Amino acid sequence: MSKWAGIVLAGGMSSRFGEPKALASWQGSTFIEHILKLMTSALQEVVVISHSHIKERVEQLVQVPVIEDIPHYKGNGPLAGIVSGMEYIEADWYAIMPCDAPNVSHEWFTILLEQTSNNYDAVVPIINGRKQPLLAAYHNRVKEKIYALLQEEKRSMGQLLSQCNVKYIAGEDIQANADWFINVNTKEEYVQAQKDLSNE
């Protein structure tokens, strides 16, 4: 069993963005390719959770498995995506990554891995006072908790965290750059992220 695996969440509808964010251009490739390049350099196995509308297009771009949510839980947000990835790859710990945080660094996965221990169910960063449950790590044992929540039609990451023994890590304590955690939700944020990139 590989100890560490990565799950990239690319199944959202990107309604505020106006087109699939996973396929947005970034540094000569796309968000999804850029994020996978970083993750595959740090983790043994990675799977992408995609929406049926873009699955084939994503498969053409990447060299890792691309799957959809488990049919019974399809459309139940990030929890469904996470548990689908956990079922697909057997591992002890899973690093979760949304497809719309293109500033993330390879370094982040190294930091995250170092923070895990069997005493905890999850490791979640707190950046500028906000929890970041989708740029976090979850132990395999969380899978049963997710299934229980989905059975009760509960979909929020907060509900999962409330049932887990979570190690919260403050960004400033672990030398994490707040920019790594910036989500691109709108075209305006996308334009700004590209400007910031060209100014570096």
Swiss-Prot record:
<feature type="binding site">
    <location>
        <position position="69"/>
    </location>
    <ligand>
        <name>GTP</name>
    </ligand>
</feature>
<feature type="binding site">
    <location>
        <begin position="9"/>
        <end position="11"/>
    </location>
    <ligand>
        <name>GTP</name>
    </ligand>
</feature>
<keyword id="KW-0342">GTP-binding</keyword>
<keyword id="KW-0501">Molybdenum cofactor biosynthesis</keyword>
<keyword id="KW-0963">Cytoplasm</keyword>
<dbReference type="GO" id="GO:0046872">
    <property type="term" value="F:metal ion binding"/>
</dbReference>
<feature type="binding site">
    <location>
        <position position="100"/>
    </location>
    <ligand>
        <name>Mg(2+)</name>
    </ligand>
</feature>
<dbReference type="GO" id="GO:0061603">
    <property type="term" value="F:molybdenum cofactor guanylyltransferase activity"/>
</dbReference>
<dbReference type="GO" id="GO:0005737">
    <property type="term" value="C:cytoplasm"/>
</dbReference>
<dbReference type="InterPro" id="IPR025877">
    <property type="entry name" value="MobA-like_NTP_Trfase"/>
</dbReference>
<dbReference type="Pfam" id="PF12804">
    <property type="entry name" value="NTP_transf_3"/>
</dbReference>
<keyword id="KW-0479">Metal-binding</keyword>
<keyword id="KW-0547">Nucleotide-binding</keyword>
<dbReference type="GO" id="GO:0006777">
    <property type="term" value="P:Mo-molybdopterin cofactor biosynthetic process"/>
</dbReference>
<keyword id="KW-0808">Transferase</keyword>
<feature type="binding site">
    <location>
        <position position="21"/>
    </location>
    <ligand>
        <name>GTP</name>
    </ligand>
</feature>
<dbReference type="InterPro" id="IPR029044">
    <property type="entry name" value="Nucleotide-diphossugar_trans"/>
</dbReference>
<dbReference type="InterPro" id="IPR013482">
    <property type="entry name" value="Molybde_CF_guanTrfase"/>
</dbReference>
<feature type="binding site">
    <location>
        <position position="100"/>
    </location>
    <ligand>
        <name>GTP</name>
    </ligand>
</feature>
<keyword id="KW-0460">Magnesium</keyword>
<dbReference type="GO" id="GO:0005525">
    <property type="term" value="F:GTP binding"/>
</dbReference>
<protein>
    <recommendedName>
        <fullName>Probable molybdenum cofactor guanylyltransferase</fullName>
        <ecNumber>2.7.7.77</ecNumber>
    </recommendedName>
</protein>
<comment type="similarity">
    <text>Belongs to the MobA family.</text>
</comment>
<comment type="function">
    <text>Transfers a GMP moiety from GTP to Mo-molybdopterin (Mo-MPT) cofactor (Moco or molybdenum cofactor) to form Mo-molybdopterin guanine dinucleotide (Mo-MGD) cofactor.</text>
</comment>
